[in-house]
Amino acid sequence: MQKICVIGAGTMGSGIAQVFAQNGFEVILRDIDMKFVEKGFGTIEKNLQRNVDKGKITADEKNEILSRIRGTTNLEDAKEADFVVEAAIENMDLKKQIFKELDEICKMETILASNTSSLSITEIASATKRPEKVIGMHFFNPVPVMKLVEVIKGLKTSEQTFNVVRELALKVDKTPIEVKEAPGFVVNRILIPMINEAIGILADGVATAEDIDEAMKLGANHPIGPLALSDLIGNDVVLAIMNVLYEEYGDSKYRPHPLLKKMVRGGLLGRKTGKGFFEYK
């Protein structure tokens, strides 16, 4: 397995492309518009330059890594890939459409993975004629730094597919954990309701955003507070995951807080928009 195709050049897609390229894989980075591909390349270049400045890699190594990544807007280019990982937005209809097209384009032996943070792998796989070769490969943000990968089996995912993806995660210096499909998987089922609760505490006026985050950092030994983490993940992404949990389980503990909804409606999405629970310059 030498050639990887990453669908989506946003925050997650560009990070995934970087990690594979750093570990010797040829990468096709695809998005619907060249401006998104170029933005993804810019993010990768900036990340690698930071590593050069810190003395972790040389300028030549940086250029070598970048040379392994090829940008495209043509989904047909995925036919060259031995492995595809999709990192589009968290929208089931969109993901199913992408997987339907990939199923028609890609070689029959190609494994199709989704970086979804909460959606059903079984449902995504239903759009294909190869459900045994569809799997979840959930990376965490920032991808080049975070070690964990949740490897999620759908109802029909084969053991062989799981083993290949688990080995692939190890090859890119990640720690894979095996997850049976369930809404939110492991990390987000625990983490996102905690963030939602912190938003509720803020909305109730119990404490300021700064003090809520300080409390969790010093009182629970968290490296980052829940509200700053929500800003980092993207408040729109947090809301999308809460909606999935609430729709799937129907349990009020997963109901997204009205303040979170209001912030997303108002475009206060966190770091990517410069303002969320905190301001960013």
UniProtKB/Swiss-Prot annotation:
Keyword Nucleotide-binding assigned: no
Gene name tied to this protein: hbd
Coiled coil location: none
Family per similarity comment: Belongs to the 3-hydroxyacyl-CoA dehydrogenase family.
The protein's name in its UniProt record: 3-hydroxybutyryl-CoA dehydrogenase
Pfam families, A to Z: 3HCDH (PF00725), 3HCDH_N (PF02737)
PROSITE patterns documented for this protein: 3HCDH (PS00067)
Catalysed conversion reaction: (3S)-3-hydroxybutanoyl-CoA + NADP(+) = acetoacetyl-CoA + NADPH + H(+)
UniProt organism field: Thermoanaerobacterium thermosaccharolyticum (strain ATCC 7956 / DSM 571 / NCIMB 9385 / NCA 3814 / NCTC 13789 / WDCM 00135 / 2032) (Clostridium thermosaccharolyticum)
GO molecular function, one term: 3-hydroxybutyryl-CoA dehydrogenase activity
Domain of life: Bacteria
Species classification: Bacteria, Bacillati, Bacillota, Clostridia, Thermoanaerobacterales
EC number: 1.1.1.157
UniProt site (Important for catalytic activity): H138
